[in-house]
Amino acid sequence: MASTRLTIALAQVAPAWLDRAATTDKVSTWIDRAADEGADLVCFGEALLPGYPFWVERTDGARFESALQKRLYAHYAEQAVVIERGDLEPL
């Protein structure tokens, strides 16, 4: 039986926080770099696009009527990946 080899690269990359386009460009660069090194598959951490919402822990994120939270979440939602919109097409 023939052996099949799969080379997997694990990328620990910081996002361009809350900037979907810039982070997508960064991911694309890392995919190319890993492929040049022989990777067949490149794995990135969850929440890389658009970045983990760490502010929830630091800004009283559970407050429903907080104007600050509403602004932060609106920007976060605006930068989120939407498959149907084609956000991952460049990758």
Feature-to-residue mapping (PLM):
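Hydrophobic structural segments
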Residues: 1-91
